[in-house]
């Protein structure tokens, strides 16, 4: 009998990662396979810029996973992240007739209005409900409360439309069904942060190769999300000014770089080896690394809204490949004046695996493991024999794909969960919203006509002619009654 499993793919700037695993009854995860493909030639700053090469990477990952699992893959979970993702607050106001009791339908209406907001060249990926203002008070759950003025405050997560469209195009061209798209920063946050950190207020910093992602939580709610185009590769590029090749500069960074070196520990006579024939002055090397690290840290801290900078009682949590640099936590403490800094080397879930990429706990697999943890639909297809594999590995990753597993859902049910609607889902939601809007307009038109008829009737009844005729009829009736 074919085994069930979940497949997730992370589209990173340095590498694209595919993972297959199973979720156990005790909440743990068993990893069955992991595959990596170099993506530097098709993804920059977390954004797809070469669709054809991205399709090739995706196809290769699926083929390798199928080969390892000896089983078809019907659909995959996908992480969405990268440059230009940002959050923006939006307030929707609704005045109520008199003192009205707030219903869930009213809340859904606010969510629908917010979801249908348009921004130039931007796509709303998700919206995190911040709170509701009821008259002059703020509430998280306003249903059942009586008021005359209601405001919904939302944090919209925006991304460039063409970036969003490129992801959908790549998976369509590669014939891979998407089970669900998730905001990668939110999926990872749910796997590396504790509930107490989110409630107390914390700053999560994912130090990646091309980008640094900053998420701010307070009272258990996402309050800010931004991606800055700075990462570990910027340090590598700066080091090339000392004449090493890119590959050598990367190796030197991984071997020698520290985020901070006490000046008393710098030996001006010490040189770092590039290869057997070349060396670089350690002092210059240290100066370059520290300058770029400081720039990244300062820019990350600058992303935190002023209203939350003094509310981070849960501290700062660092993750991603850049968090492995020695003394990186010290630099964050120095620049933010926050002493509580934790490096999240691994997810909070129990993960069973023998793969060194996972067991080494470097923080570089946290996002894809977070995506895997989010999965709740089977991605496994039929089993096949090795003899048949060559004929099967190029089949479309569909069949019993996402549509066969996924039940229709209300878009409002996914608000704030990190779920990103696919292009097909978004189109369906827009059509449903249009039908609903047309129905409401028709109902409003009929109601207006009915009210107009009733108003005309009232005016007619109150007119002088009508009053005279009623009086005359009454006079005639009374006269006849007296004669009888």
Where are these regions (language model features)?
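Nucleotide/phosphate-binding catalytic cleft detector across ATP-hydrolyzing
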Residues: 1-15, 19-202, 259, 307, ...
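Residue-level signature of catalytic and energy-coupling elements of molecular machines
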Residues: 8-9, 18, 78, 171, ...
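A short acidic Gly-Thr/Ser loop motif
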Residues: 9-15, 80-81, 196, 204-211, ...
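Phosphate-binding glycine-rich/basic clefts of nucleotide- and phosphate-handling proteins
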Residues: 67-68, 82, 156, 161-172, ...
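Glycine-rich phosphate-binding loops at beta-strand->alpha-helix junctions
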Residues: 80-81, 258, 312-335
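Extended, folded domain segments that form the structural surfaces/walls around functional sites
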Residues: 99-104, 198, 206, 302, ...
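A general structural motif
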Residues: 208, 292-301
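Glycine-rich phosphate-binding/hydrolytic loop that grips phosphoryl groups
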Residues: 344-399
């Amino acid at each position: 009998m074919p085994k069930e499993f979940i497949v997730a793919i992370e589209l990173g700037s340095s590498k694209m990662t595919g993972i297959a695993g199973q979720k156990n009854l005790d909440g743990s995860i068993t990893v069955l396979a992991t595959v990596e493909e170099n993506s530097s030639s098709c993804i920059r700053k977390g954004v797809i810029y070469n669709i054809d090469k991205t399709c090739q990477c995706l196809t290769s990952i699926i083929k390798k996973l199928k080969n390892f699992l000896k089983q078809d893959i019907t659909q995959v979970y996908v992480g969405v992240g990268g440059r230009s993702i940002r959050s923006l607050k939006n307030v929707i106001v609704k005045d109520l007739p008199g003192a009205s009791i707030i219903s869930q339908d009213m809340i859904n209406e606010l969510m629908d209005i917010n979801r249908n907001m348009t921004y130039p060249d931007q796509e709303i990926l998700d919206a995190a409900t911040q709170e509701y203002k009821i008259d002059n008070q703020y509430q998280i759950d306003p249903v059942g409360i009586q008021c005359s003025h209601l405001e919904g405050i939302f944090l919209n997560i925006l991304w460039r439309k063409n970036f969003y469209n490129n992801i959908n195009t790549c998976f369509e061209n590669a014939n891979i069904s998407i089970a669900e798209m998730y905001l990668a920063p939110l999926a990872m946050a749910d796997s590396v942060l504790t509930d107490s950190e989110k409630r107390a207020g914390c700053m999560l910093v994912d130090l990646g190769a091309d980008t640094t992602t900053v998420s701010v939580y307070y009272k258990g709610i996402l309050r800010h999300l931004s991606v800055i185009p700075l990462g570990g590769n910027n340090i590598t590029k700066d080091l090339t000014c000392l004449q090493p090749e890119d590959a050598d500069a990367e190796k030197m960074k991984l071997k020698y770089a520290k985020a901070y070196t006490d000046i008393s520990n710098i030996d001006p006579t010490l040189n770092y080896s590039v290869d057997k024939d070349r060396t670089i002055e350690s002092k210059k090397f240290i100066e370059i690394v520290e300058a770029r690290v400081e720039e990244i840290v300062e820019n990350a801290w600058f992303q935190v809204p002023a209203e939350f900078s003094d509310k981070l009682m849960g501290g700062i949590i660092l993750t991603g490949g850049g968090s492995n640099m020695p003394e990186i936590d010290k630099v964050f403490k120095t620049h933010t004046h926050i002493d509580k800094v934790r490096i999240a080397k691994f997810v909070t879930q129990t993960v069973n695996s023998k793969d060194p990429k996972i067991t080494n706990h470097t923080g570089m697999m946290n996002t894809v493991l977070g995506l895997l943890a989010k999965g709740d639909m089977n991605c496994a297809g039929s089993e096949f024999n090795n003899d048949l594999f060559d004929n099967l590995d190029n089949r479309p990753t569909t069949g019993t794909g996402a549509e066969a597993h996924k039940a229709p859902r209300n878009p409002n049910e996914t608000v704030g969960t990190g779920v990103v609607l696919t292009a097909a889902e978004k189109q369906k939601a827009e059509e449903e919203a249009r039908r609903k809007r047309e129905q409401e307009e028709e109902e409003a038109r009929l109601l207006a006509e009915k009210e107009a008829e009733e108003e005309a009737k009232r005016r007619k009844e109150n007119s002088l002619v009508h009053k005279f005729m009623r009086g005359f009829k009454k006079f005639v009736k009374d006269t006849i009654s007296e004669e009888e």
